[in-house]
């Protein structure tokens, strides 16, 4: 069993966003060995009966984060587009009636009931008119196959996967998403994922990803390990670190991981789940509210606000909760334009990729398409290497020689 020092919990700031009931809980960052390592969270029976046809209208996180107050003040995510990379979302779920959800997938997978339930739960946290963090946001859903999927359906064409992490991230960026929420483990992804994340950073798109539920350091198996990605761990409603939550150098913040009211995917009976998946969707939703409130702030400044408002003492970083549990109130109260226009999570503890130089080169169009085949299709080479033209017929990327903005900066 591993323990970290407990510390006093800062007082919450209205209208919402605090850790622990009334902000009085101590932060005991405690990790224990746990069997609760299910991909969608650990399941326990819910005590309250409900009918499957009725919408689930109560969630503990809704009162915990004072989201009713946020809605009353107009913080609903209106005008913001969130991308959800997960299984297929059941848009017929009563909790999602009235939500704006658009399936932007390029293909259709054959998923299990478990995978559909997980994706539907994530969509519920994000945009449900009843309990969603950002009920007026537009949600783009992208179908990703995972361990629970039955088959890849129409998603594999001529050996190319149309639903890989890098393909879906690039598609979400091209579709205009401002925030991407991913509550899935990844394993090894290769260089294509690195350039997809560089693409998101270059376009000012925030990726939020779960830390995992293995009660272990899982920095190598989740997207949070990458530069610029908001890795999310889980806390309990008393403010302590959740025993099931993984941790690692990629963690940036934390949020409540449960209990979350849902339906069992097999029996359709009420149950509760918990996990970093829920924490991730909560963080993505709160970032959408910050985007709505501060439309003129840059992505870097929004991220600066996230780490500077984290509830760790002095916002100091640790591998369990990053810079501290998210303070939703701080994100909408504090004007992020006061902060530097610099990405505070571009380089993570122990090193991460893409490097700052790789992101800068990608942004300026200076990564040669002859050096890697894994660049996004939308990438345009703007460097001065005229030898690239010799290979133009074999390349998928456009070439605009000598047009990099770096050449014109003073």
Regions found by a protein language model. Give the residues of each.
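N-terminal domain-start motif of subtilase-like serine proteases
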Residues: 55-82, 106-111, 327
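Active-site-adjacent substrate-recognition loops and nearby beta-strands
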Residues: 67, 72, 210-229, 233-250, ...
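C-terminal subdomain of the subtilisin-like protease fold in secreted/lumenal serine endopeptidases
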Residues: 294-409
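Secretory targeting and sorting signals
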Residues: 1-53, 410
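Hydrolase catalytic cores
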Residues: 144, 257-326
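Subtilisin-like serine protease catalytic core
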Residues: 71-82, 88-102, 110-159, 227, ...
């Amino acid at each position: 069993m591993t323990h970290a020092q407990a510390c006093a919990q800062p007082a919450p700031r209205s209208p919402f966003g605090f850790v622990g009931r009334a902000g009085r809980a101590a932060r005991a960052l405690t990790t224990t060995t746990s069997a609760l390592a299910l991909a969608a969270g650990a399941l326990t029976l819910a005590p309250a009966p409900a009918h499957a046809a009725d919408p689930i209208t109560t969630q503990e996180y809704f009162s915990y984060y004072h989201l009713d107050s946020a809605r009353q003040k107009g913080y609903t995510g209106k005008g913001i587009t969130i991308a959800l990379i997960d299984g297929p979302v059941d848009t017929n779920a009563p909790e999602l009636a009235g939500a704006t959800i658009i399936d932007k997938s390029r293909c259709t997978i054959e998923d299990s009931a478990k995978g559909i339930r997980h994706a539907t739960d994530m969509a519920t946290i994000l945009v449900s008119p009843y309990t969603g963090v950002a009920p007026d946001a537009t949600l783009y859903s992208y179908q990703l196959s995972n361990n629970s999927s039955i088959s890849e359906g129409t998603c594999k064409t001529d050996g190319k996967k149309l639903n890989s992490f890098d393909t879906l991230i690039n598609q979400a960026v091209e579709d205009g998403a401002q925030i991407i929420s991913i509550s899935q483990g990844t394993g090894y992804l290769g260089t294509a994922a690195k350039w997809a994340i560089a693409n998101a950073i270059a376009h000012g798109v925030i990726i939020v990803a779960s830390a995992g539920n293995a009660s272990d350091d899982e920095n190598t198996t989740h997207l949070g390990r990458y530069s610029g990605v908001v890795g999310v761990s889980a806390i309990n409603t008393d403010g302590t670190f959740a025993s099931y939550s993984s941790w690692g150098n990629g963690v940036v913040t934390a949020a409540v991981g449960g209990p979350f009211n849902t339906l069992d995917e097999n029996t359709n009976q009420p149950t509760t789940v918990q996990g970093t998946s829920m924490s991730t969707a909560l963080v993505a939703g709160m970032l959408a509210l910050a985007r709505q409130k501060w439309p003129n702030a840059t992505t870097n400044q929004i991220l600066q606000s996230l780490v500077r408002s984290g509830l760790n003492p002095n916002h100091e970083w640790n591998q369990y909760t990053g810079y501290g549990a998210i303070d939703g109130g701080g994100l909408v109260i504090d004007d992020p334009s006061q902060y530097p226009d610099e990405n505070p999570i571009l380089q993570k503890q122990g090193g991460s990729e893409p490097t700052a130089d790789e992101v800068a080169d990608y942004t300026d169009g200076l990564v040669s398409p002859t050096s890697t085949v894994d660049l996004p299709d939308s990438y345009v080479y703007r460097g001065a290497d005229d030898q690239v033209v010799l290979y133009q017929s074999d390349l998928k990327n456009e070439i605009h020689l000598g047009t990099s903005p770096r050449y014109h900066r003073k």
